[in-house]
């Protein structure tokens, strides 16, 4: 039976391995070791309350992950308080897919964003995740753009 719990430091190493597995599945190019940066990010933001994750557990095994980062930007009409949830780290072990785990994890982190006071939640969805998010009620925003900064 699948049980759900919040991520703690105890599960962080496995959570990071699953995050990297997710990025690989999505076709990311591995040109650096992300483990130290991920560990630093999650540790700092879990401690200050600006990152939360729910896990799906089969016994002691993590079989699904989710993540919500909380950011604030100047208020705008679509989000008058400026608080935004950034959804990430949505991953389900391939052996556990199509069992409703991702939907349950999504619901739990959406509730976390609501409790934090976010006016909107954003995600850059993988091709595999689009149906989950649209079924949940997410809508595409064709205005989203990004610019990659070169580090000097």
Model-derived regions: residue spans:
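Conserved acetyl-CoA binding element of GNAT-fold acetyltransferases
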Residues: 78-94, 143-146
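Conserved GNAT acetyl-CoA-binding A-motif
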Residues: 106, 113-125
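Conserved GNAT-fold acetyl-CoA-binding loop/helix
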Residues: 20-42, 82
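Conserved acetyl-CoA pyrophosphate-binding loop and the N-cap/start of the following alpha-helix
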Residues: 96, 100-108
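Conserved beta-strand in the GNAT
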Residues: 55, 61-70, 86, 91
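A short beta-loop-alpha structural element at the N-terminal edge
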Residues: 3-17
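Conserved beta-strand-loop-alpha-helix junction that forms the acyl-donor binding cleft
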Residues: 121-131, 146-151
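A short helix-loop-beta-strand connector motif used in the catalytic cores of GNAT acetyltransferases and
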Residues: 43-55, 86
